[in-house]
């Protein structure tokens, strides 16, 4: 499972020019799944993301988690995180999970994030989406359960 986390001051996802989800300060998560991804990997990522200390404390040090600052999450599915660009000029996405399995993984991931008490807004799995965000920092962190 792969997640690209960006700390944002605001973010939104639109489908057909209609805002489907939006947040204020928090994390934009771009989420990709493979066929072999498991609930244990989801649990690991949920724990890491919900406890990740990348928000500044009063001393200006990255020392606070998203829970500490009352932040929100916008989670957007993105199979292109599994792009293979080693051959040719057109990426291959054979490493991305079967859509049915990946959708289940994405849903479980979002449900478990919400179960931590975080507000979680989402896109729609498989939809053509437009994502708008304002990076804060910028802070961008890559998670890969296979790395």
From Swiss-Prot:
Subunit and partners: Homodimer.
GO molecular-function terms, A-Z: D-tyrosyl-tRNA(Tyr) deacylase activity; Gly-tRNA(Ala) deacylase activity; Ser(Gly)-tRNA(Ala) hydrolase activity; tRNA binding
InterPro entries: Daa-tRNA_deacyls_DTD, DTD-like_sf
Main location: cytoplasm
Matches recorded under NCBIfam families: D-aminoacyl-tRNA deacylase (TIGR00256)
EC number(s) reported in the record: 3.1.1.96
Protein name in the entry: D-aminoacyl-tRNA deacylase
Designated gene of the protein: dtd
Compartmental location: Cytoplasm
Statement: the UniProt record of this protein carries the keyword Cytoplasm: yes
């Amino acid at each position: 499972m792969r997640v690209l986390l960006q700390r944002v001051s605001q973010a939104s996802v639109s489908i057909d020019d209609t805002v489907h989800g939006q947040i204020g300060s928090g994390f934009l998560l771009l989420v990709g799944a493979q066929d072999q991804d498991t609930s244990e990997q989801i649990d690991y990522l949920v724990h890491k993301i919900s406890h990740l200390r990348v928000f500044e404390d009063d001393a200006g040090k990255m020392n606070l988690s998203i829970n500490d600052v009352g932040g929100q999450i916008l989670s957007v599915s993105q199979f292109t995180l599994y792009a293979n660009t080693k051959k040719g000029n057109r990426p291959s996405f054979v490493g991305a999970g079967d859509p049915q399995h990946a959708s289940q993984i994405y849903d479980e991931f979002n449900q478990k994030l919400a179960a931590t008490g975080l507000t979680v807004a989402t896109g729609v799995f498989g939809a053509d989406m437009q994502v708008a965000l304002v990076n804060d920092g910028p802070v961008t962190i890559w998670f890969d359960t296979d790395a």
